[in-house]
Amino acid sequence: MAPTADVLPPVEASTRPGLLVQPSDTKLRKASSFRTEQVVIDGYNLKIQGLVASARYGHVPVLDPSAETRKRIDDSVQSLIAKLDRGESIYGINTGFGGSADSRTANTRALQLALLQMQQCGVLPVPSTFPTGEPSSAPFALPLTDTESSLIMPEAWVRGAIVVRLSSLMRGHSGVRWEVLDKMQKLFLQNNVTPVVPVRSSISASGDLSPLSYVAGALAGQRGIYCFVTDGRGQRVKVTADEACRMHKITPVQYEPKEALGLLNGTAFSASVAGLATYEAENLASLTQLTTAMAVEALKGTDASFAPFIHEIARPHPGQIKSAKFIRALLSGSRLAEHLENEKHVLFSEDNGTLRQDRYTLRTASQWVGPGLEDIENAKRSVDIEINSTTDNPMIDPYDGDGRIHHGGNFQAMAMTNAVEKIRLALCAMGKMTFQQMTELVNPAMNRGLPANLASTPDLSLNFHAKGIDIALASVTSELMFLGNPVSTHVQSAEMANQAINSLALISGRQTLQAIECLSMIQAWSLYLLCQALDIRALQYKVAEQLPTLILASLHSHFGEWMDETKQQEIAAQVLKSMSKRLDETSSKDLRDRLVETYQDASSVLVRYFSELPSGGGADPLRNIVKWRATGVADTEKIYRQVTIEFLDNPYACHASHLLGKTKRAYEFVRKTLGVPMHGKENLNEFKGEFEQWNTTGGYVSVIYASIRDGELYNMLSELERDL
């Protein structure tokens, strides 16, 4: 894609959500990495990618200046004027609105202002200059929620809505002059002026009337409407709309007949939020499949669950096929995962009782997320249509010789409700699966030899690392499951029962963005845990690489006079097999206790060998077994502690890279790019006087979360997908 042609100036790092770009060099780098072709708004070709770039990443879209576009806009305006000159009665232009459409007026301009007045009813923070009386209660109280973020829409939603509304109006079906559209683009998009819009008040029936009334009021320079602007220090501040217009030398709009109605009557806010949600959901779906592949590696699973026969031949649902292909590709080259092509037939007599297949959270991952991928794709198609549609009423056909006026209900935003509720259900399914994968990962009864709570240190009795995350995951997953409930089943009759059915699309879209926040947190915790688990696997592998030499040397030292070298190698293989199994089974205990049990079990191999000798070997071999156990425990513990120190002294060294498949890029992104280290150094040192100097676990998880929410991680994921 071509570089962005126009980029907005940086704006304030505010506590409010949804601002465009933070001022730090890091944040500017992240924003500039989101590239899109120049967005040209013509009413027919707006893409979700362009909407997101314009809403969140400072891209400045331009209006299509072509003669054809200008002509259809001008023709619709002239058709409307001609009908009014003939004295025709036209809804919303010389009649009342909605259930009051039986009223009539000849003052068409005043009617447009009455519409704005009627709809500007949302609850916002009270500015200090507002003319109010003295408070009757205590003058100060701490708020229960953040007043700004709980009452004011994020700027990204508003910018997106302005882009969508311009796309609709540029189609020439609404009777709104080019001059109005041009000023909208210049004031709001080019000069980065964002109206302050209430979060609540829309039922998305006759479109998002109330939110759009604040946009229209700002364009008209209403003193009671506020806007976010960038001051001389680069900070985002609120000023009145008339002041915002003065700052940028833009004359406020005086609305002609139907123009205020044309700005208000549409699904722009619902479509904006749906578009932003769709983009995030697509990326989170890819991330969920990536963390699933990493979980397969961390749990020593198999790519056989994603074999083409299962998905492409036996049950060819498109989402399932897509997911299995992606996960299988991510596991390519992994030394931790088992591979279908290397699968061995195991005889019943050789089967030692291990799981013959992965558990459901891995084995059925593609069947679980596949339908959600299809739903997200369907939602994307709906949003693509919506942001290139006319959602006004009445509508003017500029190609009809008489400029026929159509009365309909394109503002009923149920298509957006349906889209975001499908997305939300898909997000819930992904979150539930990821949560269960993580509970399996931290549980020593299920994780195939990883230590309890993913503690990387030898003494688990002083390291409960992942336990808090396990609890936090349950909390946020529960919240996500609640958000999965539909909004559309809670419709209330409104506006004198005229709007007896209403889509609630914006409300549902808001819930979907909350669900996106929850799943983003779940994935941030998951990436943190998975990288820790992969480092521990690498630690275990490095220890395991040294054990054959250690065991063979110890057998030679203690039992060389009773067994030749060939027998020593044979016994060593049996001892190592026994040790591997027992170490997996005791991963909830401190290292020394594990090793004592492990060598106790392994000594049965030696007892059996000596008991089968013709002479029994005498008493010396039995005494040597006791010595062998004690020496083995001490020597193995020494190796384990040395390797642990080596790993924790270099917590950013990406110890597991050589073991991973294509997931290596994500693992190294967390360790190197984000600077999130392997955990455990403070536990290894038993918290010796340095506790106050360490970053919290949550602090590091927050770094991963931030990279998801600002899109930096998605850039990495996009590059990874391109390289598969």
From Swiss-Prot:
Placement of covalent cross-link 5-imidazolinone (Ala-Gly): 205-207
**Superkingdom of the source?**
Eukaryota
PTM summary from the entry reads: Contains an active site 4-methylidene-imidazol-5-one (MIO), which is formed autocatalytically by cyclization and dehydration of residues Ala-Ser-Gly.
GO BP terms in the entry? cinnamic acid biosynthetic process; L-phenylalanine catabolic process
Describe which pathway this protein belongs to, using the record's wording: Phenylpropanoid metabolism; trans-cinnamate biosynthesis; trans-cinnamate from L-phenylalanine: step 1/1
Instruction: Give the residues annotated as active site.
Output: 91
Location in the cell? Cytoplasm
Positions carrying 2,3-didehydroalanine (Ser):
206
EC assignment: the record states: 4.3.1.24
Q: Provide the binding site for (E)-cinnamate.
A: 265, 357, 363, 393, 467, 495, 498
Q: InterPro entries recorded for this chain?
A: Aromatic_Lyase (IPR001106), Fumarase/histidase_N (IPR024083), L-Aspartase-like (IPR008948), Phe/His_NH3-lyase_AS (IPR022313), Phe_NH3-lyase (IPR005922), Phe_NH3-lyase_shielding_dom_sf (IPR023144)
Q: What's in the keyword line of the UniProt record? A: Cytoplasm, Lyase, Phenylalanine catabolism, Phenylpropanoid metabolism
List the GO cellular component terms: cytoplasm
One annotated GO molecular function is: phenylalanine ammonia-lyase activity
**Subunit relationships:** Homotetramer.
What is the recorded function of this protein according to its Swiss-Prot or TrEMBL entry? Answer: Catalyzes the non-oxidative deamination of L-phenylalanine to form trans-cinnamic acid and a free ammonium ion. Facilitates the commitment step in phenylpropanoid pathways that produce secondary metabolites such as lignins, coumarins and flavonoids.
User: Record's NCBIfam families?
Assistant: phe_am_lyase (TIGR01226)
Q: What is this protein called?
A: Phenylalanine ammonia-lyase
Give the species. Mycosarcoma maydis (Corn smut fungus)
